[in-house]
């Protein structure tokens, strides 16, 4: 039977000093010997997805104490990608993921905590905590802050749904009046919660369900709805049960590496493809697999992208549906139910409830269950009232959306497309692969050929688009924005947004070794690996070179002979220390970012640290 980790600091006469300090935090004699459970919160007033989390830690802590554990809360940082977007702040977003993972490891190992409840929500916080969970491999449950309600406003006598991306597009569209732009801005983000479409935050919180690390409804129940409180309370109670199963019953199925195993990663990727999740999820799942020491690659993802259909289409891929609509249609579990009936899932994997995925589908899929409480749970809907308070309303839809022919979630026979919403491409310009969100690509753009228009920074690309230098038919190439080259692998939401604002959304393709926001749609291909700064072919592309993109065949080709590429490579190498660096970019880089860049791998490895290099440095 495993010994409680916390016994290191709570047992024995030689730990009198540590116990004295524990007593100063409120612990008493009866607490020593109970499991100490870390409540890992991420409250901040900078981020709407986290602004309502201040009291959530103590809500969970109360449930832990009531169930027989000792709860100790601490906080991580949280970066808002939307606010950091379009300026140097975005350089810090992806590195913050790894900083969060490290900070959780530091706190949990320094204080010998026995288990964790991770209260996350937005883009880099959920994956950062997930990486830490896999690294530490102690019992854990994820519970997120929940999605924002979709915005609504009246334009041209019509009520339309809105989200953050609409505000960005219309704000840069010269044909939109100041009055309408202001209306959209004021209505796009009406409540606390993660932005209302299938962007990165909501994608990751949905994947936490599919991995078995979060409770049913975690990815889709609105932040404002009263029913979400039960997820926090249940997480606090259930983590004590998980902890007992491991430490008292020696049940290793309670550990995250045995829950989020390779088969669970398969299920999560199937969900991701079926719901057209953010391309960032590929980066984060690869990083999670690395931390769990699971051999899971972009090749595995590519195989699934060819056989998994798209069963759910949500903003930004369509204006019709947002996360509140996904929840009404049965949420993540109902999508998994359709995938299971299509024979695509591994349903015998365990979860934090102590059951299997098959059990969860049988109980929570709204097309299968007769449980009226579960049906009521999925009828939880928006109130349409501006607020930053959690659990502030209890509105419900009159009916569920169980229409699997024309609804938000479809069955296999009525899929939005037979191939899913994400695809991995490869070719001489991306030898180790690149990623596109096919859910947001129109059918007439699945094959595209055009001349390269080169930019060596996102800033230059934005200026080029807005100044009219980019024309229809071009492939906009933004390079040296990868994990190492940025550094930090910026999101390219502004270039894609401004292409749409200038009427070029379907007339141009965009290719980058950077990444894209979950709010991106259109022919936007990111994560080109190897990146330019790591000797990738994308660094050798010259102005006017023809690039051919073929999503159905999963190919992307720079139409330049191998002989010419070798000549260009030799010329690049001859530059010595200036090789594989942008020619004219002026960008101050802090020591914190230099530290990240020194060890960063390309996107096909999840942009995690280069472990081989790190081991070599330490061994020296």
From Swiss-Prot:
GO biological processes: isoleucine biosynthetic process; L-valine biosynthetic process
Q: Which domain of life is it from?
A: Bacteria
Report residues binding [2Fe-2S] cluster.
Answer: 122, 195
Q: From the UniProt record, list the reaction(s) this protein catalyses.
A: (2R)-2,3-dihydroxy-3-methylbutanoate = 3-methyl-2-oxobutanoate + H2O; (2R,3R)-2,3-dihydroxy-3-methylpentanoate = (S)-3-methyl-2-oxopentanoate + H2O
Keyword Iron included in the entry's annotation: yes
Quote the record's binding site residues for Mg(2+): 81, 123-124, 491
Q: Which GO terms describe its cellular component?
A: cytosol
Q: Please give the pathway this protein is involved in.
A: Amino-acid biosynthesis; L-isoleucine biosynthesis; L-isoleucine from 2-oxobutanoate: step 3/4; Amino-acid biosynthesis; L-valine biosynthesis; L-valine from pyruvate: step 3/4
Q: Name any cofactors this protein relies on.
A: [2Fe-2S] cluster; Mg(2+)
Family designation: Belongs to the IlvD/Edd family.
The signal peptide here is none
Q: Which residues carry this modification: N6-carboxylysine?
A: 124
Q: What does this protein do?
A: Functions in the biosynthesis of branched-chain amino acids. Catalyzes the dehydration of (2R,3R)-2,3-dihydroxy-3-methylpentanoate (2,3-dihydroxy-3-methylvalerate) into 2-oxo-3-methylpentanoate (2-oxo-3-methylvalerate) and of (2R)-2,3-dihydroxy-3-methylbutanoate (2,3-dihydroxyisovalerate) into 2-oxo-3-methylbutanoate (2-oxoisovalerate), the penultimate precursor to L-isoleucine and L-valine, respectively.
Indicate the quaternary assembly.
Homodimer.
Under Pfam families, the record lists: ILV_EDD_C (PF24877), ILVD_EDD_N (PF00920)
Cofactor binding notes:
Binds 1 [2Fe-2S] cluster per subunit. This cluster acts as a Lewis acid cofactor.
Instruction: Give EC number(s), comma-separated.
Output: 4.2.1.9
Q: Active site: which residues? A: 517 (proton acceptor)
List the protein's name.
Dihydroxy-acid dehydratase
Q: Which UniProt keywords apply?
A: 2Fe-2S, Amino-acid biosynthesis, Branched-chain amino acid biosynthesis, Iron, Iron-sulfur, Lyase, Magnesium, Metal-binding
| One function term, GO molecular function aspect | magnesium ion binding
